[in-house]
Amino acid sequence: PTDPEDAALLHFTSGTTGSPKGALHVHGAVGAHHITGKLALDFHPADIFWCTADPGWVTGTSYGIISPLTHGLTMVVDQADYDPARWYSILQDERVTVWYTAPTAIRMLMKAGPELPRGHDLSSLRFVGSVGEPLNPEGVAWGAEVLGLPIHDNWWQTETGGIMIANYAAMDIRPGSMGKPLPGIEAAVVRHEDDAVSVVDPAGEEGGLALRPGWPSMFRGYLGEEGRYRKCFKGGWYLTGDLARVDEDGYFWFVGRADDVIKSAGHLIGPFEVESAIMEHPAVAEVGVIGKPDPVAGEIVKAFVALKPGHEPSEE
């Protein structure tokens, strides 16, 4: 018989340096896939579900295949290239009720304009979720305005194997927030030095996002890299490598990857916060922010901006 700790899945995830890491998951992870589908994506047996992630990625496996199967859902599978008109047609024609996609796809749909969705009947949709990167507040507002539904962002990693923090269906969404930890998940914002880990206090301070180990879908190792795996755990916490803050009401907010933070004139600047501010401009369709080396400040903020149709760049 299969044991819950028997190896089941090997998901590869890119590292900031070196070759991709193979994260090992066990058969017992299916328990987390099942319950998080219910709690974070509001699965019901009669749902028609479409996850736009490719099955070669962890989302496409965990939530494009495994989780919906455990709930007996009808699933939409589409392998064609992205096309906004066809996507809206799929939502309409297949009567999709739960849609799980990525912030990049949402921004591409935003860029395509509001006329396309107005020409389709999207009344079957009752829940829209996003994952893979932070969802800017503008994306949440677009969902409410164009789809008639707010978009529920959530957070997890290849290493966590399943959704850890989410904007549940029944909770008030704070645009830009990844939500709150799921039941049974203990998350905190921490600082660590050597093996000492301390929880950040007060609320609102930035630090490393950490989870207490022990949930069923937690990865059990990196293929052939035991030392690298051990370094992820310190002081009774799994250190995710992401930076975050938590507000006084327990909502978590993504700041950036620890190795992506821009260090400028003694200040730590999260690219996502700058991107969110730029995205507020009505002419902006897409933006990416990096740190550019500077002899005085160490790094300065550099933004790459794509404009919406009908807008031209200028020196201003």
PLM region spans:
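Conserved pre-ATP/AMP-binding loop-to-beta segment of ANL
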Residues: 1-12, 19, 42-48, 125
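Conserved AMP-binding A3 loop
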Residues: 8-32
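Conserved AMP-binding/adenylation subdomain of ANL enzymes
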Residues: 31-51, 55-98, 111-112, 116
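Gly/Ser/Thr-rich phosphate-binding loop
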Residues: 46, 70, 96-101, 110-174, ...
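AMP-binding/adenylate-forming catalytic core of the ANL superfamily
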Residues: 92, 99, 215, 220-221, ...
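Active-site glycine-centered loops adjacent to acidic/histidine catalytic or metal-binding residues
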Residues: 132, 156, 179, 242, ...
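Conserved ANL (AMP-binding/adenylate-forming) active-site segment centered on the GW(Y/F)…HTG consensus within
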Residues: 148, 196, 212, 216-241, ...
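Conserved beta-loop-beta connector loops within the AMP-binding
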Residues: 188-212, 248-249, 312-315
